[in-house]
């Protein structure tokens, strides 16, 4: 979030935010402390045209853990840069007593970066120590079962991996926005999410938005009390209420 001061005006730019993540508890206290006497509030409006249920990340982790306990081989499609979702996946794997793996250097490096920067401040929540999945040790890994968190860029590796796993014991937890594989315009721009899902016989969607819902947006406006509010990242005709 940014406070911009110029020509005697104070502008508060929120960027993306939400209240239903692990860091959401700091949203309102931060605004009350710093977002005072604001002339213009620039707030995200991604969810203004959606009525998605925004469950808390804790619930996301709980649902994932239940799936991880039910299936021996679990692959999770998630963003490498979503620190809170990665924490949910890590905690779910711990609850299910399964080892967490990655299969790309980028996913591994982002987890390492998050650990170095945020582990201590988050009391271990954002501390990650995944193992790298390697095909030369696959038989040993298969015996114990695993959780593999990956992105669409690894589709060729995942396709190769699936040939070695029994279909009935393998599942994909799709942990991204459903619009990527449902909305024709989104598929036309980037078909990789749909193609990735279609590799699997068993698929379950477990996700919550990375953006503020309408209730949270209204609460932010009520706390900041700006003279003017500008919504960004929204559909053209979307309104708060």
Language model: regions and residue ranges:
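Short low-complexity, flexible loop/linker segments enriched in glycine and/or proline
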Residues: 115-118, 219-221
């Amino acid at each position: 979030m940014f406070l911009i001061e110029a020509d005697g005006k104070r502008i508060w730019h929120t960027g993306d935010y939400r209240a239903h993540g692990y860091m959401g508890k700091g949203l309102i206290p931060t605004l009350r402390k710093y977002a005072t006497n604001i002339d213009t509030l620039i707030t995200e409006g991604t969810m203004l045209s959606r009525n998605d249920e925004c469950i808390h990340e804790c619930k996301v982790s709980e649902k994932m853990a239940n799936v991880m306990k039910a299936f021996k081989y679990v692959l999770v499609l998630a963003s490498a840069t979503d620190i809170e979702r990665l924490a949910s996946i890590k905690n779910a794997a711990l609850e299910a007593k399964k080892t967490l793996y990655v299969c790309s250097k980028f996913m591994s490096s982002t987890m390492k970066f998050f650990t170095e920067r945020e582990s201590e401040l988050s009391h271990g929540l954002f501390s990650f120590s995944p193992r790298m999945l390697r095909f030369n040790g696959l038989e040993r890994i298969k015996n114990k079962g695993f959780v593999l968190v990956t992105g669409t860029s690894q589709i060729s590796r995942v396709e190769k991996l699936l040939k070695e796993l029994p279909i009935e014991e393998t599942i994909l937890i799709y942990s991204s926005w459903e619009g990527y594989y449902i909305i024709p315009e989104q598929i036309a721009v980037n078909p990789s999410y749909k193609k990735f899902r279609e590799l699997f016989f068993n698929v379950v969607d477990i996700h919550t938005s990375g953006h503020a819902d309408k209730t949270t947006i209204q609460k932010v406006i009520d706390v900041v009390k700006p003279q003017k509010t500008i919504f960004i990242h929204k559909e053209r005709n979307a309104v708060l209420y």
